[in-house]
Each structure stands twice: as structure tokens, then as C-alpha cells.
Amino acid sequence: MNTLIEKYKKNSNFRLAVQLLFILVLSRVVMLIMVPVYNGIMGTNRSFSFLMNEWDAKRYQFMVDNGYTFPLDTDPQANWAFFPMYVIVCQFVKLLTFWKADTYWVGMFVSNVCIYIAAYFGIKWLRDRYEINNGTQPDINNNYGILLGVLMFMAPYSFYCASVYTEAMFIMFIVLFFYFSQKKQWLIAGLMSAFASATRIVGCTLVFALIIELYLDYKNKNTVIDSKKAGIWQNVRDFVIHFIKMPKEILSVMLCPLGTFIYMTFLRFFCGDVWAFMHVQIAWREDSYFPVIGVMWKACTGQIEPRYTYMGWFCIAAFAVYAYMIYRKYYSMAFFGIIALLVPLTSHVMSTCRFIIGSFVIFIGAYDLMTAGGREYLELKNEKKIITIDSIVLIIFFALELFLLFLWYNSDCWLM
């Protein structure tokens, strides 16, 4: 015991792992406590695993146990829309139990492990970024960055990361992508993007984030002509010339969409349509709007259901956060967040709240607003005021998460 205490005091990585585990367990205990609260209010007697796994979770449960729907099956909502990475990992974990464990519990275990890993490396990314920008390490004894873990475990809509949904795994691969990109380990970053693209289609768009990271790295090494002395196009041209001479960087970029390409190849032989994951989407979304602009106009002006009006304005808020992140020089993250949101907005605003949370970068924007960026804007220097404001924001976030969790347990359509 004394050895562990000593290790906790001296080893910052071990201390971070323990702190995050405590926060994760605490957040999940709250979810457990909400089960009898929900059952008492609604007069039901449902289990935790039942309440935590709505809608798509049931499809993932079916896929883990039975695989993809065969082309001759009559289900109009064929599960080809769901990418395979999460299912494969859940199947492997269930195999370790000799197929005895309940699939929902297997999926929740995988999701919680993934979001825990994501939070750990997300904070490591923050601390490395601080050191790069300031030339000195942050005060880790003051738990620098731990707020990010609190947001990822307890912020509104974070319950998706505890259920049998792909959000936690997708976030993990995104975090690892940015973590290794910051360390200039481009091949590993490309591999993480490949895994992300095998988890959700928008994982492919990490290729743009990688190109931005490569460009910024090249520019920071002073190998690109100063943009004040030369136009932006000359800078880009010089970067492209450099890029095509670097096979390692080219391979890293080519790896990014590999997961999606492998899945498309599988679909070609399985059902004869490489775009089946896209074509089957019509079973969920019958409405037809002009991409992005038409979708947002219809939603934000209340021309469709009230829940979609809410989601439309939620998207507006997300775009505002991404714009702020560009101002704060989180370039690759901000552009990834924008592109990842534009993809679903080509058809509808349905589920965009989940997609925004599931792209991870919104957590970084919120974290920056609650720490350095927000303090700079509000010109806050009094530590007590800072702590008070952050505490109020966290309490509001936690209250919203409890409210949304109750709606989730109740299968409320506002979360679809």
C-alpha cells in the first residue's frame, strides 16, 4: 500500500490514471443511481443495461451476436449503415468469455474502456501542448487538464460513451490521432485515423486534419517561406513540393481512409454495393433538403419538428465553438469538427448532438473556454472568481446531463 501511495505521489502518469478512474467510476455510479430514480418516477422495473442501451445499441447488440444482415433479408433498415470496428472489438471481448457474457455488458465495458483511454491521452495531449507553447511543463501537481476528463465523463450527452454506441471508440481513435500527430509520429496518426474510419464514416475526414498538421509542422520548421513575404499560395505550393518528396508522410495520409475502403470492399462482395452504407440511410431519413444550407434553414426556422429546431441551433453553437477554436489556433481540430458536422448536415440535423459530442474536439473548445481562453476574454485574474465561474458551469453541465440521462432512459425522441 505504501508503495502505491509513493508511486501516486511521484509518478504523474499513474496519478492521472487513478484520478481519471475515480472520476469515471463516480460518473457511472450516478448513472446507476438514476435507474431506481427513473423506475420510481415512471413506475417501471427496468434494468440498468436495458435503460442504457436504446435504439442503435440494440442493432449493435444484434451485430455482435449475428453479424451483418444478409441481402435477402427483409429488414428495410439493414445494418450495413453501421461500420464494423466497434462490433469486431466487442466480438473479440465476448470471445474471451467463451460467448457467455451478456452482449450489452460487453459493449458497455468496451465503451467505458475506450472513453477512459481517450480521456487519459486527451489530457496528455493538453499537457504536451502546454509544454510546446510555453517551453515549460504545466503544474501537474495542480491537476492541470483534469477538467477535460470531467467534461468527457460528465458533460451533457456523455452518457452515449457509456452505452453500446460507437461514440467512445470513435473519440478514442480521434484523441490518439491528435496525440500522435502532436508528437510527429505521422504513420501511427494515420493508422489511428484508419481505425476511426472503420468505426464511423467521418473518420475519413481526419485526413484533412493530418494535412493541416503536416503543413503547420513544415511551416514551424521555417522551411516554408514567411507568409508575410510571400503569398499563401506560394507557401502551399512549397509545402506540396516538399510533401510529394516524403514517402512516409504520403503513406500516413493514404492510411487515413483505409478503414472505410476495407469496409467498402467487404460490402462489394457481401451485397454487391460498395455504397450500401450510404444508400441504406434512406430507411432512417426520408426527408429531402438542400444540403447544409437548406437543412439548417428548415431546422433553425422551425419548419420541421421542434426537436430538430433545437438540434439546428445546437449545431450553430457548435460552429461558434469551432470558430473560437480557430481563433485560439486549434486549427486541425477546428476544421475536423466543422467537416465532421457538415457531413451529416448534407441530409438532416437528426442525431447531430450525438455526432458533435462524438467528434471529441468540442470538449477541447469547452475546456479552453473554461480555462485560459475564457479567462483571457473576461479578463479574470482573481482565482476565486475563476473557480466560482467554472464550478457554476460544471454544476449546470452536470444538471443537464442528469436531465438528458432521464430522457435517455425514457427513450425520448429528442435524443434521436
Question: What role is predicted for each listed range?
Answer:
Residues C114, I146-S181, I188, F195-F208, ...:
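Multi-pass, polyprenyl lipid-linked donor-dependent membrane glycosyltransferases
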Residues C90, V106-N133, V321:
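Transmembrane-helix motifs of polytopic, lipid-linked glycan transferases
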Residues V253-P257, G373-L415:
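Signature aromatic-anchored transmembrane alpha helix within multi-pass, membrane-resident enzymes
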Residues G135-N142, F177-I188, Y218-K221:
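Membrane-interface transmembrane helices that cradle and orient dolichyl/undecaprenyl
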Residues E54-T69, D75-W99, I293-G294:
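Short hydrophobic/aromatic helix or loop-helix immediately within or flanking a transmembrane segment
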